[in-house]
């Protein structure tokens, strides 16, 4: 059954320059209202970041689509997400690749995201409670790394876990944040500024 709210969102994303049909299809089929509180459900398909508790947010749909598209994912891509949050970005990735690894520093958010993903029959995701600055070394190296919080500097551990030819999308900065796309070429990392963004900070350590 068609969802007019989802239809409207996808039309907006297309008009905003999103071209990857796999990203559009993934976001069209996912019930975004399942990833926000009941009080926020009426805004679920608006192009806004929404609070999810613990000082964190679910990113605006355009940014989710843009960051996912920039990774140029293949079905077999080994993907690491830093910042599980609500699980929405995780779910979008899981529609496109065979398996997603996701690290969340706030235990309550990790468990809530796991519950949501299970309710939606999304099982090709492994989540971990831990420090996102450290990545998930035992599951790497990764073809793609997506970071959903802003780092003051690019975490060295994440660069080292990126496969040769792999791509990372990460917001960097404090008050002024730039969305960077980084591609590894041997021992070199080629960085491109995509656009200005605003994310919650990538905090070191983990929180029970």
Curated annotation (Swiss-Prot):
Cytoplasm among keywords: yes
Keywords recorded for this protein, A-Z: Cytoplasm, Methyltransferase, S-adenosyl-L-methionine, Transferase
The positions flagged as active site in the entry are 59
Q: What domain of life does the UniProt record list for this protein's source?
A: Bacteria
Query: InterPro entries per the record?
Result: PCMT, SAM-dependent_MTases_sf
**Which reactions does this protein catalyse?**
[protein]-L-isoaspartate + S-adenosyl-L-methionine = [protein]-L-isoaspartate alpha-methyl ester + S-adenosyl-L-homocysteine
Q: Where in the cell is it found?
A: Cytoplasm
Q: Name one GO molecular function term.
A: protein-L-isoaspartate (D-aspartate) O-methyltransferase activity
The record's PANTHER family line, in alphabetical order, gives:
PROTEIN-L-ISOASPARTATE O-METHYLTRANSFERASE, PROTEIN-L-ISOASPARTATE(D-ASPARTATE) O-METHYLTRANSFERASE
Q: What is this protein for, i.e. what is its function?
A: Catalyzes the methyl esterification of L-isoaspartyl residues in peptides and proteins that result from spontaneous decomposition of normal L-aspartyl and L-asparaginyl residues. It plays a role in the repair and/or degradation of damaged proteins.
**Protein's name in the database:** Protein-L-isoaspartate O-methyltransferase
What gene makes this protein? pcm
């Amino acid at each position: 059954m068609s969802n007019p709210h989802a239809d409207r969102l996808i039309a907006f994303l297309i008009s905003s320059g999103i071209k990857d049909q796999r990203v559009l299809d993934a976001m069209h089929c996912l019930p975004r209202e399942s990833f926000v509180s009941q009080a926020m459900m009426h805004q679920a398909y608006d192009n806004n970041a929404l609070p999810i508790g613990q000082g964190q947010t679910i990113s605006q749909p355009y940014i989710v689509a843009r960051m996912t598209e920039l990774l140029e994912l293949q079905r077999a891509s080994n993907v690491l997400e830093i910042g599980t949050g609500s699980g929405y970005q995780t779910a979008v990735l899981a529609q496109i690749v065979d398996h997603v690894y996701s690290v969340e520093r706030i235990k309550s958010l990790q468990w809530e995201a796991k519950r949501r993903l299970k309710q939606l029959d999304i099982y090709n995701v492994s989540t971990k409670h831990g420090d996102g600055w450290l990545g998930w070394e035992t599951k790497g190296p990764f073809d793609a790394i997506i970071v959903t919080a802003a780092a003051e500097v690019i975490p060295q551990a994440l660069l080292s876990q990126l496969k040769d030819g792999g791509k990372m999308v990460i917001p960097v900065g404090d008050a002024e944040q730039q969305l960077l796309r980084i591609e590894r070429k041997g021992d070199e990392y080629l960085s491109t500024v995509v656009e200005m963004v605003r994310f919650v900070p990538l905090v070191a350590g983990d929180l029970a």
